[in-house]
């Protein structure tokens, strides 16, 4: 018999050591790449020490101002560089070379070369800003770590500009002796201005080699001790959290619960946040929160071995079903053929262009773009495939146990999170499919069978249809035969891979086939399901705002009002955008469209609208901007969502092309180097200008509510105070964001860094307070809804519960109980008064002041209608 307690202690030791190994591996990758300055400890040192060195450089400059006599040769050159930039470059080079046995002279020359490059390419950037920005963007996209490569690319760019523009002169290299003096001067300033505990951080030392005295740099002993302590401390901060094989310790205080060993448990509090504030969040203050979290921790899970067996074969055979392929999208052996004739492939830039015909040059440009897209997609593929391997490995490890458990904790808004780095009920499709409830429950009644069928329909992709249609489709004989085939041989009958949630659907297929077989044998009552049937909110944030403001329009859009079929708010916004775009497709020559710096009219406008029509204006395009609206999204974040949509289309086409052994097709006509109006920037601006106002045409409640909350946050900041209010669960949400002054140092080729400066820490940041207030408020309320719902389920005897913020799951036969709790708790939260009025009054009473802020009026929507809505959670 297994000693599960002893095993749990061993697992937590592995979690602790796993976090250390992960940290050390990350840092070692930086060192191996020659970028020791990018290790965690050196990044910290850089940010702290730039300021004193910059002051040292300024003192050096001031020393010779107004002095008679000849100034040092280095001075004139250092006047061309900002102090902070020179300090950053110097320390970054020193840190990269410190442990390479480089001599003091070699380090000095490298520093000077980087300083020269900064001056040189700053000149280029000032003369051809847009062009150089494209060069830097291209370098960033290539993800190169090689400074030499970046330097060579910039030199080619400089040459190209000089050949086109007679007013721009090519760079004349600084003499070597000048470089040595510049580098030596900066190293002397570094030694004399940067201290730690009264000792210089960097100091020169000497050693004899072959009869010669060689000077080199080293760090002081105290800094070495600090680095060692930093490594040990940071490495232990983030254990590789994993499931438990015995129930986690119940939370009794904000600091006592969760994992079983001190070294792991001490890294997690029940609630993230300021320790002084967290102390207030006791069981007495919020008993329902403790009750809900501990119930979630007691839910028994187990590995779904059927799904595990399939995904292991998918990985072994690299089939790519529902997961990234394990074959690189692009590498040295698998790269699109270079269209440039072999005899010209060694040429670069303008020299290459002169040797090619216009058609060949365009083919070359297209090839470069295709390779860049593939390399970007490959980076993501590699990361995702590695995550799959880690997840499957952990599932294999825990498949030996009958039951496993998860530790839960909360963020500062009381949102609930599983504390597991890989395998988790809050994971992606594969992660959720690899888990199932330990408890198996029957599907005997009509209601239980209905929800079991609806679960399969949802996972397949019929979640926008009525419940009756979903059930009917699942009971269709042809669909049943497909599910039986899949369960019998999922690697031959692969229709499951095309489902909306492939692996969760596969898990359901295994159970459905078993159920059908038992029905055929007249033993249906023996069937037991282990799968959670999830009930998801319809854009939860907008649901909460619409409920608290009793907004009829919003309530209908997000299914708070009863309807014959589920309402699709993302699709509704997409339809508004489609109509607007259609008008521009038929626009006359007099019609103009302006967004930011982009103005389109006539032919240009029609072409842009037609391009988007061919790409497809779908709910996928509008989903993220709509979904994030209640959480503080802006027009700028809307534009970022449009970019993400296009990038996602490109990545999917690239992956499909590799799987089919062909060149990827273009999914859109937008190109950076086009001379017309169909550039990516213009396309993103155009679509953003259509989507952003369309959202407010469909829903208004979030906008007026967020405006009022921001006003309250501004009022608090003007008083130099934060916000603090009590959620329906008793959780006290505190928001107090202090101003910090951060100076970002930017270089042309060596990246940038935020340096921390000594600032007053008692000033509230007004802009940050206003930006965070509305998202925190609505997150706090949807988290409260989750906690209150879980408490009701516990009271009704439900012990198997899955939650992911606005998604709730339990067994099919308990789903009706869950749905009643979900709807009832939503009504109870808002039926008694106005949540926004309570928020305002709580602060006015504490501040003893009338803020003058007006609370938005509530509408006519009857909250009790929620109880009759079939699709509010579906």
Swiss-Prot record:
GO terms for cellular component: DNA-directed RNA polymerase complex. PROSITE patterns: RNA_POL_PHAGE_1, RNA_POL_PHAGE_2. Keywords: DNA-directed RNA polymerase, Nucleotidyltransferase, Transcription, Transferase, Viral transcription. It catalyses: RNA(n) + a ribonucleoside 5'-triphosphate = RNA(n+1) + diphosphate. Pfam families: RNA_pol (PF00940), RPOL_N (PF14700). One of its GO terms (biological process) is viral transcription. GO terms for molecular function: DNA binding; DNA-directed RNA polymerase activity. The active site is at residues 536, 623, 806. Its EC number is 2.7.7.6. InterPro entries: DNA-dir_RNA_pol_helix_hairp_sf, DNA-dir_Rpol_C_phage-type, DNA-dir_Rpol_phage-type, DNA/RNA_pol_sf, RNA_POL_N_sf, RPOL_N. DNA-dependent RNA polymerase that catalyzes the transcription of viral genes. Belongs to the phage and mitochondrial RNA polymerase family. This is DNA-directed RNA polymerase. It comes from Enterobacteria phage SP6.
